[in-house]
Amino acid sequence: MWIQVRTMDGKETHRVDSLSKLTKVDELRVKIAELFNVEPERQRLFYRGKQMEDGHTIFDYNVGLNDIVQLLVRQAVAATVLPKDKEAELSDSDSGCGSAQSESDKGSTHGESDVQSAGASGQTDTADLIDPGFGFYKINEFVDARDLNMGAWFEAQIVKVTKTPAEDGGAEDIVYHVKYEDYPENGVVQLRGKDVRPRARTVYQWHQLEPGMIVMVNYNPDDPKERGYWYDAEIQRKRETRTQREVFGKILLGDAGDSLNDCRIMFVTEIYKIEEPGSAEGPGASSDSPLKKGSNGPECKVCKDDPKKNCRVCNCHVCGIKQDPDKQLLCDECDMAFHTYCLNPPLTTIPDDEDWYCPDCRNDASEVVLAGEKLKESKKKAKMASASSSSQRDWGKGMACVGRTKQCTIVPSNHYGPVPGVPVGTLWKFRVQVSESGVHRPHVAGIHGRSNDGAYSLVLAGGYEDDVDDGNEFTYTGSGGRDLSGNKRTAEQSCDQKLTNMNRALALNCNAAVNDKEGAEAKDWKAGKPVRVVRSSKGRKHSKYSPEDGNRYDGIYKVVKYWPEKGKSGFLVWRYLLKRNDEESAPWTRDGKERIKKLGLTMQYPEGYLEAVAAKEKEKENKNEDDIEETPTKGKRKRKSQSMEEKSSPTKGTPKKMKVEAYKLSKEQKALIKDDELNKKLWDEAMESLSLGPRFVNKVEEVFLCICCQEVVYQPITTECQHNVCRECLQRSFKAKVYTCPACRHDLGKNYQMAVNKPLQAILTQLFPGYSSGRC
């Protein structure tokens, strides 16, 4: 097993070979020290957001084959620092991450006192007006103030009036210091005279409204049917019917010239006159104007602020009863309120903690693993056979233990028949690669299936002495009857097999009724369910049809019959006769071998495997040379033989590149591609890969990948911007009120018609048969 180790800045990456799942983090540090010249004490290793600590194995952190572990080098510690202080210093400075606030910051109230004083002054609505001697407005006067970001008007009060030099060098400008009544957290805001005006107080009657008038209206740009904020608007037209009155206007968004045209004003009875500067009638007129607090609508859209209605949104999230506000806690995560006596268990007093989280939002601190702490015990791994085994054998070096690095998503796991893009004769070095390709999903088990559905694939590895392999047909022995306790992979037959689990699944593939007593034979065996067959090199000693190395996909077979009999071990076993039923030639035939050459099929290795093997061989050669030099000899050292030199020296010249047979499209497929005019550019890109043979299918998969689900598009919607998305994915996006293309954010509009691209769906179904299963 091998992994990649990369520095945090990404500048240096090295492969660490000869690892096991049981390799300790301490041992890994030693190997990293040799490659990066960094002492183990200065190494901080991270994998998937977790800091790897000594005492654990890489299996504890679920590190997979060829995965990347990040290395952060600690700064060299000064010699004067005591060892007990070392850890405390490294926690913040070396990681490059900021820690919590300092004590001085926590105790600081700078910035809050101004807001609190502003809020306190806001409570004195009856304060006397003070004339500053310049400007239209007095201190403590109620006005309407514009928010410069939104362009909307809000109720405010002037707290200070000052002068500032004009930008053009003319007369001094007057600056009004105002605070918004409903938003005290904004503090005091400085505004020019054009952004402040007397509090609106005059409501226009219907007959007074005329096109071209500039008025003040309530409008919600996000949801026009709901109550929003107050904007200036120019009336464009009005219409009156027997049942309703409608006003349409242009919403003015500040002085920048931005506007929203032809907007329907929902609240026609709340259209206000814009007061001119200096037109305030007196101190009481502004504060008692119709435009007062609450004019932006009820705070709770569920209960409409009805005090008689219970509401779990604006009040206690458990009982919803509007009482005891002094005994309510507000969750700092979800902003929901909870009565102290409604919690489970109930609280007798309000907690002193600054932050409080409800039971749904709270994270259990005991389950959080902090940097420098050991991992918590995993219940799942505690149940594994390896956890309770007393064996000292290192089981973590096998390729069956490394886990998949990718997963086949072209077809579902319960797919019958060939996997698109995997021709007969495909070779893999390890079983885990067969699993990644989707041909045979289990890493170790010989049969993949479901006892209530059937078997999808099997591996012929010569594991049972009763197996007989004749190439186009073979007799297969079922699974079970062996004691595999203690994490064993194989054992001698120790009891009778039963027609259950995978044995029953394989029996369901036979075109005959299931008989768990005597077995059954199909009258028309070709009508049975197909089984993908993989032959392993482990069966080479029993069968000449097995590959010399690795695992080979040999095509589709079908179950002819199955029956119980006494095996060579003396126990009852279930036998299955399978015959080949595939259009592609078998890989051991002349035609099959020629096809393999034409398709350019060679052994497939895991990523980084060849480099790891080469490095291991080089290390072994260097070690042998060192041993020879250290061995005392009387004469001169013998010269290497010619055969050894040829073996060690690299092959001269580049190997001749084999010509791969091009992928052939049927006339129907070519016609469908031609009909898909919307994706002509993408098809032109994909068609360039026809010369690569089976890799053409992989190219099509890459080109027509849905950006949302990362699978081949199903029921594809080709958008205006020439992107393809699954209809279900786009519907989910629209349901979340996101009306843009998931790929480029082009605005599709709320009423976008989702028409399925039928030619594209048809060609994808032919290239990837069965990929639509489970996606309806």
From Swiss-Prot:
Recall the GO molecular function terms of this protein's record: hemi-methylated DNA-binding; histone binding; histone H3K9me2/3 reader activity; ubiquitin protein ligase activity; ubiquitin-protein transferase activity; zinc ion binding
Q: Where is this region: Disordered?
A: 88-126, 278-298, 617-660
GO annotation terms (biological process): animal organ regeneration; heterochromatin formation; inflammatory response; intestinal epithelial structure maintenance; lens development in camera-type eye; liver development; negative regulation of gene expression via chromosomal CpG island methylation; negative regulation of transcription by RNA polymerase II
Zinc fingers, RING-type, are found at 706-745
The residues listed in the UniProt record as binding DNA, with positions renumbered to this chain, are A461, G462, D467
Feature type site, description Required to confer preferential recognition of cytosine over thymine: T477
- Reading the lineage from the top rank, the first entry is Eukaryota
| Residue(s) at site: Required for affinity and specificity for 5-mCpG sequence | R489
What SMART domains does the entry give?
Answer: PHD, RING, SRA, UBQ
Where does the record place the site Required to discriminate between hemimethylated DNA versus symmetrically methylated DNA? N487
Q: What happens when the gene is disrupted?
A: Embryos have a small head, eyes, jaw and an underdeveloped gut. Moreover many mutants display diminished yolk consumption and uninflated swim bladder as well as embryonic lethality. DNA methylation is impaired during embryogenesis and embryos display defects in lens development and maintenance. No fertility defects are noted for heterozygous animals.
Q: Report domain YDG positions.
A: 417-580
Presence of keyword Chloroplast: no
Map out region (Histone H3R2me0 binding) in residue numbers.
331-335, 351-353
Q: What role is this protein assigned? A: Multidomain protein that acts as a key epigenetic regulator by bridging DNA methylation and chromatin modification. Specifically recognizes and binds hemimethylated DNA at replication forks via its YDG domain and recruits dnmt1 methyltransferase to ensure faithful propagation of the DNA methylation patterns through DNA replication.
Report the protein name in the record. E3 ubiquitin-protein ligase UHRF1
Q: Which organism is it from?
A: Danio rerio
Taxonomic lineage: Eukaryota, Metazoa, Chordata, Craniata, Vertebrata
